[in-house]
Amino acid sequence: MTVLIIGMGNIGKKLVELGNFEKIYAYDRISKDIPGVVRLDEFQVPSDVSTVVECASPEAVKEYSLQILKNPVNYIIISTSAFADEVFRERFFSELKNSPARVFFPSGAIGGLDVLSSIKDFVKNVRIETIKPPKSLGLDLKGKTVVFEGSVEEASKLFPRNINVASTIGLIVGFEKVKVTIVADPAMDHNIHIVRISSAIGNYEFKIENIPSPENPKTSMLTVYSILRTLRNLESKIIFG
């Protein structure tokens, strides 16, 4: 598999380290050269690339997606908070209808998306509570504080890099059905996501506590392995979930 990785932060570097690729291209505006990786000075999708992995930012998703969709590639997107922007969301999916690309949204930092996608037509509402250390939100607080309650769209304007989980859920069931609560807790050194699903099929609750990556406490290693699983599934004859 030949891949193009957009973003050479902690996630991108881990993919290079742990992935099994024939060739790796990378596009990153600030990263230095990495051994074994062909760095692109300008954004493009080389003709031998079969899979594009975005692990940069919601801004990168908005800037490069329409160009990527012109190519017959597998496009894996992590920064799903870009889709909280309704205008971009509508344009993206309009372009996708006639695109030769296939788009994949890994589960990222949470689980339970197999359940959610299976019953999406029966979901009444989803409530997601995210508990984070204040520093990861750019805050300096002394006590546990609810810093936000509301829609995914509203949350994305205040915390654009902390709403990927809620945005992925919104893409599955519809953003209008998702309510977000963000809690900053100084006692926490990791992130907790609690997802509560109410549906005509049943009611479900998932609690995910992620251990931060040693290299970057803001990143969950589960996200890295979620991308690797998606990459393996592209070539596997057996797929679970």
Swiss-Prot record:
Pathway: Cofactor biosynthesis; NAD(+) biosynthesis; iminoaspartate from L-aspartate (dehydrogenase route): step 1/1. One of its GO terms (molecular function) is NADP binding. It catalyses: L-aspartate + NADP(+) + H2O = oxaloacetate + NH4(+) + NADPH + H(+); L-aspartate + NAD(+) + H2O = oxaloacetate + NH4(+) + NADH + H(+). The active site is at 193. One of its GO terms (biological process) is NAD biosynthetic process. It is an enzyme of class 1 (oxidoreductase). Competitively inhibited by L-malate and NH(4)(+). Keywords: NAD, NADP, Oxidoreductase, Pyridine nucleotide biosynthesis. InterPro entries: Asp/hSer_DH_NAD-bd (IPR005106), Asp_DH (IPR002811), Asp_DH_arc (IPR022487), Asp_DH_prok (IPR020626), L-Asp_DH (IPR011182), NAD(P)-bd_dom_sf (IPR036291). Its EC number is 1.4.1.21. The keyword rRNA-binding does not apply. The keyword ATP-binding does not apply. NAD(+) binds at residues 10-11, 28, 56-57, 63-64, 78-79, 109, 164. HAMAP family: NadX (MF_01265). Belongs to the L-aspartate dehydrogenase family. Homodimer. The iminoaspartate product is unstable in aqueous solution and can decompose to oxaloacetate and ammonia. Specifically catalyzes the NAD or NADP-dependent dehydrogenation of L-aspartate to iminoaspartate. Does not show aspartate oxidase activity. Is also able to catalyze the reverse reaction, i.e. the reductive amination of oxaloacetate. This is L-aspartate dehydrogenase. It comes from Thermotoga maritima (strain ATCC 43589 / DSM 3109 / JCM 10099 / NBRC 100826 / MSB8).
